[in-house]
Amino acid sequence: MLEDTSFAIQPEQDDKTQETHRIDIGNMHTFSHTEHVFSFHCDTGIVKIRFYREDIVRIAFNPFGETSLSTSVAVVKEPEKVDASVHETEEEVTLTSAKQTVVLQKRPFRVRIYDNHGRLLVAEGKKGMAFTYQGEVCCFKMMDEADHFYGFGEKTGFLDKRGETMTMWNTDVYAPHNPETDPLYQSHPYFMTVRNGSAHGIFFDNTYKTTFDFQTATDEYCFSAEGGAIDYYVFAGPTPKDVLEQYTDLTGRMPLPPKWALGYHQSRYSYETEQEVREIAQTFIEKDIPLDVIYLDIHYMNGYRVFTFDRNRFPNLKQLIADLKQKGIRVVPIVDPGVKEDPEYVIYQEGIRHDYFCKYIEGNVYFGEVWPGKSAFPDFTNKKVRKWWGEKHQFYTDLGIEGIWNDMNEPSVFNETKTMDVKVIHDNDGDPKTHRELHNVYGFMMGEATYKGMKKLLNGKRPFLLTRAGFSGIQRYAAVWTGDNRSFWEHLQMSLPMCMNLGLSGVAFCGPDVGGFAHNTNGELLTRWMQVGAFTPYFRNHCAIGFRRQEPWAFGEKYERIIKKYIRLRYQWLPHLYTLFAEAHETGAPVMRPLFFEYPDDENTYNLYDEFLVGANVLIAPIMTPSTTRRVAYFPKGNWVDYWTGEVLEGGQYHLISADLETLPIFIKQGSAIALGDVKRSTEMPDEHRTVHIYKANGGKATYVLYDDDGQTFSYEKGDYLRMYIEVEYGENSVHIVTKSEGTYQPSWKLSFAIHHATEQTKVTIDGNEQNAIFDPHQRILLIQSE
């Protein structure tokens, strides 16, 4: 019997052993440099340092062999040719670029890094780089009292990770996770430090099991790995936006997804028959509830064999997919890595024949138990296997499918360790490595194979890929959902910091299973969660077999009406959200942001985890406890306008706000703008109108960027997009708008403006021309239709 709280589920506790003796790197004796690489010869090995940009520096040390400057699959950036000066004294060597200074203490060897304003970023004190004879490597850094730590990818708990210890080892948590569960499905050995209003970051490029220890009572923190080298990058910032731009320049940014992927997704483990899928789709249509995607979980397959479908359950799958697509609904099937051992199964036959499966060093194939039973696992570290796997997705594209859901790709195995034997050997494109070293990138490389295969097969259309497992850089290929949560209020609460920290780790396209995967939800919880989901980047309702259904109508008309309202609101907000996705594609900035991201000088924002920003100027303060209609919310500097009532709240302070079950508290910063579109049943329906809502201030200037393209192809990469810069100058009784556009895309919609907090006498000009406006005295809005 499941309890009513997930506190009953406790993470596994490892036996605590005495700390292994660590050997310090020792003293530096000599140094040299060639072609932008600086080498420092120390007692126990060579440290190599290279500037990747003026504001990114890489430091590598391998105590067990040659220090290599090769990279993991996470890194896509080639180092720039950065001019750096060198200065040596008796005690130190100093390397200086235009934006960073690296000071190397000689005895013992210790690293300090400053920005170009002399701000200390990271420093080593009593301890520095060290290792053990068992193969562990570790790096200690000084921890300031003012330090706050964010990122680390997919982690439960609070937003600020100071005081926590986290492990990176992709793990399928059989019992749905709770706020103390660690590790989870993804590994992102990266974090951002915010200190006194400024930010910097560190990426530890090591694919072994890694640990980040901020739980220490001392003034040092540590990051370590079970094997490999110390190899990390320091990002100089100085703002959180700068750090994320630097990190995603190194590890890559997400491609723009198809617009349909931003719509509402409905899923269940499982919709088990063609008839059930048709009934679900038809109910959405009859109830006029927008929908873009229905998922097929594992029951669509023939005996859980990937690249098959059960012809008894789905006798006309191709026709089903075509019929739904005509109605604006796409089908996304699940694809796991496990390939059933079956001599008559063509995928298994091909894998055996071409030596595509993971093997032991002796040459025998590794088998593990997963949903199909005894199964082999493709070795995605081999480019031939990735190509083969990608090509196999023609099975799906021939059916009309444009999106894939990768699951069980940690890889998950039904055994005591929950995964593949760490002694398995991966080909690694001719440089064999153990699974112990490459475990954390298995799901990443499956994602690469899937995305690239689908992209090629779709002939210019954008594919959509959803993944459970991943590593730093996974944003290049996939959206991420946070795995098997539960239908508890605490899991709704937990989803906010999880998604915000994923966004701070470069994964802008993410979201939880709305409503909770396991356990039985209720109408109030589902409603409050759907309100939040309408503003998370990825919006999917998903629940497990054996538990209460969670479709929008599952709890009766009272809740259905409210849920429908917020799904429709999601579609109305898609122009604004799509603009933010374009920003994420271009700069790495998250769609869903913690408040400190925009207000790093405001220490009141550092620990806020129960409210978030959508972009820079929209604040969401959801209700996330039962039978609650009021909450306290913090508002940063500026004035904030209640989206529903128009009430203006002064920022820089806390406010008690009211929100009945029908209301999600949404606030727009005065002086900013948002672009809204038509309410429609699917993203397949074109917008006829686009309205830029300007929230008038009494003075000052602001710029809003509106982005659009065809939403389906990659033509935006060749300039076929619209980026409209809308510059607004506010007077006490005037609003002057200047527009400037770039790109070749010609949208079908007509542009309008709505000036909030205006009067009938407010003068409005657009590009120098005075406008005739319609005034709504009740809402105090001036409406202007642009020609």
From Swiss-Prot:
InterPro entries: DUF5110 (IPR033403), Gal_mutarotase_sf_dom (IPR011013), Glyco_hydro_31_AS (IPR030458), Glyco_hydro_31_C (IPR048395), Glyco_hydro_31_CS (IPR030459), Glyco_hydro_31_N_dom (IPR025887), Glyco_hydro_31_TIM (IPR000322), Glyco_hydro_b (IPR013780). One of its GO terms (biological process) is carbohydrate metabolic process. It catalyses: Hydrolysis of terminal, non-reducing (1->4)-linked alpha-D-glucose residues with release of alpha-D-glucose. The keyword Methyltransferase does not apply. This is Alpha-glucosidase 2. Homohexamer. It comes from Bacillus thermoamyloliquefaciens. The active site is at D407, E410, D484. The lineage of its organism: Bacteria, Bacillati, Bacillota, Bacilli, Bacillales. Transmembrane segments: none annotated.
